[in-house]
């Protein structure tokens, strides 16, 4: 009967113990304020598993397709204050509702000539047929 069912007599195989995921703190001295996502690079998801066509593959795709290793993770984290953003959220951005009536001076036509869309004859000295532009 044992020959009919050899698997029933065999001892169950214990599952192999998997190594715990690598942490940045296992290799480097990290800051106490380091967020968990930087200490555990295995938490990053969303990296490509399908191989792209090698003809169209760029170096950026090759670099970005790999998940980060513990050697590429930051060791120190410097958080930024969000005080400025909180003030803008409360009051909103400054809006200037004044009317701009200043005539813009042109570097091309000189400081005494204003750019206007209506002045067709004196827009630029190069276009004036009475004198060349080198006479200025």
Curated annotation (Swiss-Prot):
Pfam families: PIRC1_2. It is found in: Cytoplasm, Cytoskeleton, Cilium axoneme; Cytoplasm, Cytoskeleton, Flagellum axoneme. GO terms for cellular component: axonemal A tubule inner sheath; axonemal microtubule; cytoplasm; nucleus; sperm flagellum. Keywords: Cell projection, Cilium, Cytoplasm, Cytoskeleton, Flagellum. InterPro entries: PIRC1/2 (IPR026507). Expressed in airway epithelial cells. The keyword Ribonucleoprotein does not apply. Residues 1-24 are annotated as: Disordered. One of its GO terms (biological process) is establishment of left/right asymmetry. Belongs to the PIERCE1 family. Microtubule inner protein involved in the attachment of outer dynein arms (ODAs) to dynein-decorated doublet microtubules (DMTs) in cilia axoneme, which is required for motile cilia beating. Functions at the initial step of left-right asymmetry specification of the visceral organs. Microtubule inner protein component of sperm flagellar doublet microtubules. Interacts with CFAP53, ODAD1 and ODAD3; the interactions link the outer dynein arms docking complex (ODA-DC) to the internal microtubule inner proteins (MIP) in cilium axoneme. This is Piercer of microtubule wall 1 protein. It comes from Homo sapiens (Human). The gene is PIERCE1.
